[in-house]
Amino acid sequence: MASGMGTRFGGNKLMAELDGVPLIQHVIRATDGLFARCVVVTRHDEVAELCHALGVEVILHNEQYRNDTVRLGMEDMDGCATVTFVQADQPLISAKSIASLLSSAEEDSESIWRVSFEGTPGAPVLFPAWTFDELRALPLGKGGGYVAKAHKERVRTVEVVGKWELVDVDTVEDLQVLRHHVSREFEGLSS
């Protein structure tokens, strides 16, 4: 999901760089090879161009609300057993955590699966086919979390390795905090 307007960030945050790479590209790398199909839903031409260059399918739109983004992403998902919503502004999400989410869903395919850190749920979120009609008919302004909350008893979680995986970038300050974290991690590796 790459359709945020970036109002708090002051622009298109998904093309802002972390460690010399656009935020969305970090997320695309983390999903590489894990899904039968990867579709990025965005309202940003620059994001669409990058996705095309990386060989990722894109739905470019000018809709206003989160439910529109979900509906557009769900349009061609008939025949899929699950869909996974991955936020494009979580550049430190790891392939390992996403793979754990997918393998957990293979063991229990009727549950909604989401990642968490120390019991606090976050994204990505994996939805089984029985939720698809609800996802396509979300109330105005609502996202997949609305469906997960409506079926709390069917939500399961998979722990991520570290809290930084679930940090999303909403403001320039958020990005600065992540840059500081990444530089400190790099310093720790090189010493």
Descriptions of predicted regions:
Residues A137-S191:
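Conserved alpha/beta core of the MobA/IspD/sugar-nucleotide pyrophosphorylase nucleotidyltransferase superfamily
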